[in-house]
Amino acid sequence: MDLKVTTLAGKDAGKVEVSDEIFGLDPREDILHRVVRWQLAKRQQGTHKAKGRAEIARTGAKMYRQKGTGRARHSSARAPQFRGGGKAHGPVPHSHAHDLPKKVRALGLKHALSAKAKSANLIIVDDLAIKEAKTKALVESFAKLGVTNALMIGGAEIDAGFKRAAANIPNIDVLPIQGINVYDILRRGTLVLSKAAVEALEERFK
């Protein structure tokens, strides 16, 4: 399939041929859901912690004698039922990450790209580079493209001026091709790819 290429100024820059196996699939929500869950689970810190009864700074001596008081039988005041006692089965630091096959991850990226192409929320630009690192000029360029909420993917190296100018624009993310991922694609309304990014994706999934 052929996709239209434009410049940052909104002018026509020809067309680029892309693979239907990358940009022309029927998006599957189950695949996208699995990949997003896998990504977000990996990001969780898992540092939550509550002290158990063995970790509470309190005497371990028996509270009072076993018999003769008329009260319930108790031993340590560290027990979970007491105020200030340890937490029963409380959270401990652990990783929330789970495995996901590489083929499913790759398929998820293809389906995310196809979803943007199918919904007409994919823009191909000739290059993510500007002469002057001015945020105002970049905002004007985005207005011509109709971009207000977007993920922008460039080649292996992002133009320093473009990256600096885009840093202060809300709802705009800029990543090199190595950082492309399903979650960031889906969380933004529009996906903007440079020609270098398209070529890298074609090479990656060849």
UniProtKB/Swiss-Prot annotation:
Disulfide bonds: none annotated. GO terms for cellular component: ribonucleoprotein complex; ribosome. Residues 63-98 are annotated as: Disordered. InterPro entries: Ribosomal_uL4, Ribosomal_uL4-like, Ribosomal_uL4_dom_sf. Residues 64-76 have a biased composition (Basic residues). GO terms for molecular function: rRNA binding; structural constituent of ribosome. Keywords: Ribonucleoprotein, Ribosomal protein, RNA-binding, rRNA-binding. It holds the Pfam family Ribosomal_L4. GO terms for biological process: translation. The keyword rRNA-binding applies. It comes from the Bacteria. SUPFAM superfamilies: Ribosomal protein L4. One of the primary rRNA binding proteins, this protein initially binds near the 5'-end of the 23S rRNA. It is important during the early stages of 50S assembly. It makes multiple contacts with different domains of the 23S rRNA in the assembled 50S subunit and ribosome. Part of the 50S ribosomal subunit. Belongs to the universal ribosomal protein uL4 family. PANTHER family: 50S RIBOSOMAL PROTEIN L4 (PTHR10746), LARGE RIBOSOMAL SUBUNIT PROTEIN UL4M (PTHR10746:SF6). This is Large ribosomal subunit protein uL4. It comes from Chelativorans sp. (strain BNC1). The gene is rplD.
